[in-house]
Design a protein with these regions (language model features):
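Extended alpha-helical targeting/anchoring segments
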Residues: 1-382
Length: 382
């Protein structure tokens, strides 16, 4: 039987499972002043031949920019970062196998969006004013969805796979909230000295038939708004990666590819470069975090604007979940489609989308509700 603390990763496309149990130590930063010492401890653990797995909350991104650092609130109920230090992955992954699966609909109840359509229209209107004034040209406006959770997170994790298989499933149970993530988006992977990121920007609802799906995909590939949204984030990530990549190695091997999931089609591009030698964990995160696909562009100004418009901190949502290997390889997902499960039975997940000049409030709100289906299924949101 699997008992906390542990971290479980699953790639639903291959069925591969990686499990980490019994951490030697925990590296946790709740306060801003603990954050950079925690990153230094992570670097030291990696240098000592250890694995690290866990998460970094979205608000940690403020600390990499002096101008944004004051935006980190002192009263946080979720750590800025939380990582376990492990000797190796667990040899026995069977202990993470599911017992009898549940109906995923039974896991969450009393599901309520943080904003009504009317609330959303008001915040959208304020953001659109910034777009009109040229303060930013894209921003990823998000809202929380609150619920109650029941039962066992591990069983729920396996039960939700059927609803939406993804490459970057994760269950992080390291104390504090349990993080159940069904992310389809790679934030970055470092392998053999190369870094690659797969920004996902552009979403459309699945069709009712294969023929309709094919039609929708063709339409998506021709839609100027979708292409512009994706291109903006590709340019932003090219800029971010160039800060830690060797000159002349930056490449976009894939542009505007469509990935299909049970409820949506998503547009994805790939950006890669050869890492400069001796890059630390801090160097990589300082250049890239948080992912441009969940902030906007220009990144810093978009983050300021979103801080003023959104309800409270995003916490783990839109942060990063992943692992760091002793050989320098790393892999982190963007923590979208991610539910935080609190001890008092409360659950929170967020939904959002990129807003550009020709976006409309009602269509974007509908997209938010569509993205919530990974957790809600066909349940109506109250």
């Amino acid at each position: 039987l699997l008992t906390a603390p542990y971290v479980l990763f699953r790639d639903d496309t291959t069925g591969s499972v990686t499990l980490f149990t019994d951490p030697e130590e925990m590296i946790v930063a709740h306060e801003a002043e603990e954050f950079f010492p925690a990153l230094a401890r992570m670097q030291a653990a990696r240098a000592a031949g250890k694995y690290l797995t866990g998460y970094m909350s979205y608000e940690a991104g403020y600390l990499f920019e002096k101008k944004l650092a004051p935006l980190v609130s002192a009263q946080r109920d979720v750590p800025l970062l939380c990582f376990g230090v492990f000797t190796s992955p667990a040899g026995d992954v069977e202990q993470a196998s599911p017992g009898p699966l549940i109906n995923a609909d039974d896991f969450l109840s009393d599901i309520k969006p943080g904003w009504t359509l009317e609330d959303y229209r008001k915040q959208f209107s304020k953001l659109h004013q910034h777009l009109r004034q040229g303060d930013c040209y894209q921003a990823n406006l998000t809202m929380p969805v609150h619920a109650r959770w029941h039962g066992d997170p591990l069983t729920a994790f396996w039960s939700l796979i059927e609803r939406q298989p993804v490459k970057y499933g994760a269950l992080v149970n390291l104390g504090g909230p349990v993080i159940l993530s069904r992310s389809p988006e790679l934030f970055f992977a470092v392998q053999d000295g190369w870094i690659e990121t797969h920004p996902m920007k552009g979403t459309i609802k699945r069709g009712a038939s294969p023929a309709q799906d094919a039609e929708l995909i063709v339409g998506m590939m021709k839609d100027e708004k979708t292409l512009a949204e994706n291109r903006m984030i590709v340019d932003l990530l090219r800029n971010d990666i160039s800060r830690i990549g060797e000159v002349g190695t930056l490449d976009v091997p894939k542009l505007f590819e469509i990935e299909t999931y049970p409820t949506v089609h998503q547009m994805v591009s790939h950006v890669r470069a050869k890492l400069l030698p001796d890059m630390t964990v801090e160097d990589v995160f300082a250049a890239l975090f948080p992912c441009g696909s969940v902030t906007g562009a220009p990144k810093m100004r978009a983050m300021e604007i979103l801080h003023d418009l959104e309800i409270g901190p995003r916490n783990v949502y839109c942060g990063a979940i992943g692992m760091i290997s002793p050989d320098g390889d790393m892999r982190f997902s963007v923590a979208i489609r991610t539910i935080s499960l609190f001890e008092d039975g409360g659950a929170t997940f967020n939904v959002g989308g990129g807003i550009v000049f020709d976006s409309t409030a009602d269509a974007e709100y509908d997209e938010c509700l569509l993205k919530a289906k990974f957790a809600t299924g066909e349940k109506r949101l109250v």
